[in-house]
């Protein structure tokens, strides 16, 4: 779930090495594995608090935007010789790209719509309309099981999922996708 370790191996690492890319990855605050416990405990005790939960994931988006901006600015002034061999940055700040897959594709819609620092990105397997996504997400299956154990029936679960969806309105890629540019 939204962890930087997803960029540390597998095909993306091989692709980066083959094409000469470097990867900067960060946990998606509010949407990563450590956040799942907070989400689960609130689902069981007070699902009505979920409309407030957009704040942490939105901070995660802002963190990603700040990292991108630092790639164009602060990181270029780094003096550590491991990062600046020959006193030059190890990357070309005019060639920054975004790649997000699954949750990274979904939340990446917000990042790509808001950033002025990246012209191109790949949104792999993205989605929009969080209430719809929650029903289809393999990661959310465990939460639905918790809901079934905590609420009386399908109607209650649907109401809780509706509340959940309203909490994501400010994060929904449907809100931001019109601002993606070519």
Over which residues does each language-model region extend?
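The feature captures the conserved acid-bearing segment of alpha/beta-hydrolase catalytic domains
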Residues: 126-182
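Active/binding-pocket-proximal capping segment
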Residues: 29-32, 39-43, 116-119, 124-131, ...
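Cap/lid segment of the alpha/beta-hydrolase catalytic domain
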Residues: 1-85
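Short, glycine/acidic-rich beta->alpha junctions
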Residues: 3-8, 52, 100-104, 168-172, ...
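Generic recognition of flexible, low-complexity loop/linker segments
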Residues: 10-13, 55-56, 84-88, 106-112, ...
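Primarily recognizes the serine-hydrolase "nucleophile elbow" in alpha/beta-hydrolase
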Residues: 70, 76-136
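Generic recognition of stable, solvent-exposed alpha-helical segments in well-folded globular domains
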Residues: 6-11, 59-66, 101-110, 116, ...
């Amino acid at each position: 779930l939204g962890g930087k370790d997803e960029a540390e191996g597998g095909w993306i690492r091989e692709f980066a090495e083959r094409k000469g890319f470097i990867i900067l990855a960060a946990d998606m605050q509010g949407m990563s594995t450590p956040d799942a416990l907070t989400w689960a405990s609130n689902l069981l005790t007070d699902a009505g608090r979920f409309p407030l939960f957009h704040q942490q994931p939105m901070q995660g988006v802002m963190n990603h935007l700040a990292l991108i901006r630092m790639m164009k600015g602060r990181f270029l002034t780094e003096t550590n010789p491991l990062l600046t061999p020959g006193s030059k940055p190890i990357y070309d700040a005019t060639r920054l790209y975004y790649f997000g897959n699954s949750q990274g594709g979904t939340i990446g819609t917000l990042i790509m719509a808001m950033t002025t620092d990246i012209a191109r990105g790949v949104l792999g397997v993205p989605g929009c309309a969080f209430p719809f996504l929650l029903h289809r997400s393999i990661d959310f299956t465990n939460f639905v099981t918790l809901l079934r154990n905590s609420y009386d029936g399908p109607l209650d679960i649907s109401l809780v999922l509706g509340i959940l969806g309203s909490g994501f309105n400010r994060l929904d890629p449907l809100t931001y996708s019109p601002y993606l540019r070519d």
